[in-house]
């Protein structure tokens, strides 16, 4: 074997004559890539948890260890989250995201190697006055999980179906242990499963924005077009610019996939790919356009050459986004983009030149572009219900500079005032605006204990902040006409009514742990969102229930617990 001295790991390999370029007695050196140690390490599932959860089995009550039932709920009315987005009295929340997190946590079985690694990591993680000590974790329970349950925790997770509309203070997920003694395992992944709040809030805000977009289309057309046409046009009014807005790649990917339940325009193809795969690779799940970046413009000596290049390589009918503020927005639109759009109109090639400002005054720039296009004949005029409207043809806009719900509404109002239907002239690209204001506190997401022990003894929390209190359980969730009209959808299991929750996961079923709720595909969830946003009531809150749509029996038990644990608090606030 040869001796080599360089910066690579080198392995000498003898190739046979079948390669056709060496004799059997020849040797060829093959270089192997030299890599450093990894920076991203696969975290043991046991450590995907809060530190106080990992050690809590040591000091939990015997009843809680025997059996614990938890629920996830959103406790805040939406108008308190953002009055520019959510209308007063409309508390519809869209439930999504649970299946993906269960896939992340439990699809691959937990192994003894993960337990060993967890033990090594925790060997010095507890701080004491006598130095660092091992942090306790219930190793024996996890060894049993691997040996007896095929590596998946024996907990059952039930929830409403993804895409369902839910309301503040309703239970949306129920988590409980199945065999006795695993009660603390029902809380182990609290901090991770609770992260469904991000998916729910992303989809909820977009579902409400879609309702607003439909109102804009309806304002123009009224009943002269079908409901399906209204939804189609409304669906064109927003494009996800969020690929670079996320704090970590997983956030951008997951939330971008969620956004596609409502609006199909996206630049985040990692999320689009996930939605595509989860739809059975259906066509039309996501779409985008050719788009110039500032770097493309800067790469040409002449800005005009760049825009002409994009227009020339685009096929007939192409919709192309031209960033126009690299040097001077108004000059670029009037002297470069307008002539291109006019030439496209003359050639009748169907191409649309889309002017995209990325700095300046958005309202001024958008209205000015529409007026300029109309002035030069790049529009059609239609009279609808005795009102004249101008519709764009070969030059339109996409506005994506720091868009917020309030700013987009402001621009739309200005366009409508001047006879330009917003959906006929362009759309809004929203990146950070879709996720910058997402927060667990917005919906007041809570993972709460509601029952313990073999007898399922009800428990709840009475906080100093009224809206942070919880309910005694366990529960059923009803969706009958009677329950919705009476605003009493949360009941005990022994009360009348059919539970709409379904099983998602049961680790005690070692051969088929994933259940009905997990299996819905992207298209099924998307359709459920559309159906329920059209048919479910706006709210289940009234003056009598204090935003807790529960049965009288749950209220009675809650008052009993209040008298026992917090007798100085006013019962009228919890009845």
Question: Which stretches of residues belong to each language-model region?
Answer:
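Terminal presequence/propeptide segments associated with secretion/organelle targeting
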Residues: 1-14
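Buried, small/hydrophobic-residue-enriched core segments of structured protein domains
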Residues: 9, 16-80, 140-154, 158-385, ...
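Gly/Ser/Thr/Ala-enriched C-terminal appendages of enzymes
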Residues: 16-110, 268, 274, 278, ...
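Residues that form generic nucleotide/phosphate-binding pockets
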Residues: 104-105, 121, 125, 192, ...
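Short beta-strand/loop turn elements enriched in aromatics
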Residues: 107-150
């Amino acid at each position: 074997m040869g001796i080599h001295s360089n910066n690579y790991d080198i392995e000498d390999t003898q190739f046979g004559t079948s390669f056709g370029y060496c004799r059997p007695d020849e040797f060829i050196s093959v270089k192997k890539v030299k890599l450093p140690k990894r920076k991203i390490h696969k975290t043991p599932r046991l450590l995907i948890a809060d530190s106080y959860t990992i050690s809590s089995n040591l000091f939990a009550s015997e009843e809680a260890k025997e059996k614990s039932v938890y629920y996830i709920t959103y406790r805040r009315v939406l108008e308190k989250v953002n009055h520019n987005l959510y209308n007063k009295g409309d508390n519809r929340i869209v439930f999504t995201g649970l299946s993906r997190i269960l896939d992340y946590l439990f699809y691959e079985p937990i192994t003894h190697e993960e337990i060993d690694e967890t033990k090594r990591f925790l060997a010095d993680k507890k701080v004491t006055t006598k130095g660092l000590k091992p942090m306790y974790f219930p190793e024996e329970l996890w060894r049993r999980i691997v040996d007896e349950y095929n590596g998946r925790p024996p907990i059952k997770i039930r929830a409403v179906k993804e895409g369902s509309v839910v309301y503040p203070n309703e239970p949306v997920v129920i988590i409980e242990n199945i065999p006795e003694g695993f009660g603390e395992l029902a809380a182990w992944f609290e901090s991770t499963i609770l992260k469904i709040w991000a998916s729910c809030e992303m989809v909820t805000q977009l579902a409400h924005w879609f309702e607003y977009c439909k109102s804009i289309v309806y304002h123009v057309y009224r009943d002269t077009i079908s409901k399906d046409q209204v939804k189609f046009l409304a669906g064109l009014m927003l494009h996800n610019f969020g690929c670079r807005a996320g704090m970590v790649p997983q956030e951008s990917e997951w939330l971008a996939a969620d956004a596609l339940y409502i609006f199909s325009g996206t630049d985040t193809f990692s999320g689009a790919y996930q939605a595509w795969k989860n739809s059975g690779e259906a066509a039309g799940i996501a779409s985008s356009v050719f788009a110039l970046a500032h770097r493309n413009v800067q790469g040409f000596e002449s800005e005009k050459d760049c825009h002409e290049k994009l227009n020339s390589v685009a096929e007939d009918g192409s919709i192309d986004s031209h960033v126009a503020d690299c040097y001077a927005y108004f000059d670029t639109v009037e002297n470069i983009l307008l002539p291109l759009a006019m030439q496209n109109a003359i050639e009748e090639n169907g191409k649309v030149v889309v002017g995209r400002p990325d700095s300046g005054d958005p309202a001024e720039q958008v209205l000015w572009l529409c007026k300029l296009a109309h002035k030069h004949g790049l529009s059609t005029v239609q009279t609808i219900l005795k009102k004249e409207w101008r519709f764009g043809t070969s030059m339109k806009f996409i506005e994506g500079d720091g868009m917020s719900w309030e700013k987009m509404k402001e621009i739309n109002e200005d366009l409508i005032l001047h006879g330009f239907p917003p959906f006929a002239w362009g759309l809004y690209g929203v990146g950070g605006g879709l996720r910058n204001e997402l927060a667990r506190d917005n919906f007041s997401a809570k993972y709460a204990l509601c029952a313990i022990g073999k007898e399922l003894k009800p428990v709840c929390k009475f906080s100093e902040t009224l809206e942070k209190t919880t309910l005694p359980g366990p529960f059923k969730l009803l969706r009958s006409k009677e329950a919705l009209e009476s605003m009493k959808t949360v009941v005990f299991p022994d009360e009348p009514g059919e539970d709409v929750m379904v099983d998602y996961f049961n680790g005690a079923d070692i051969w088929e742990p994933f259940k009905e709720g997990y299996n819905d595909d992207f298209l099924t969830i998307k359709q459920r969102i559309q159906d329920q946003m059209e048919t479910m009531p706006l709210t289940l809150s009234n003056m009598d229930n204090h935003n807790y749509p529960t049965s009288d029996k749950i209220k009675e038990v809650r008052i009993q617990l209040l008298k026992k644990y917090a007798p100085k608090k006013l019962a009228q606030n919890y009845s």
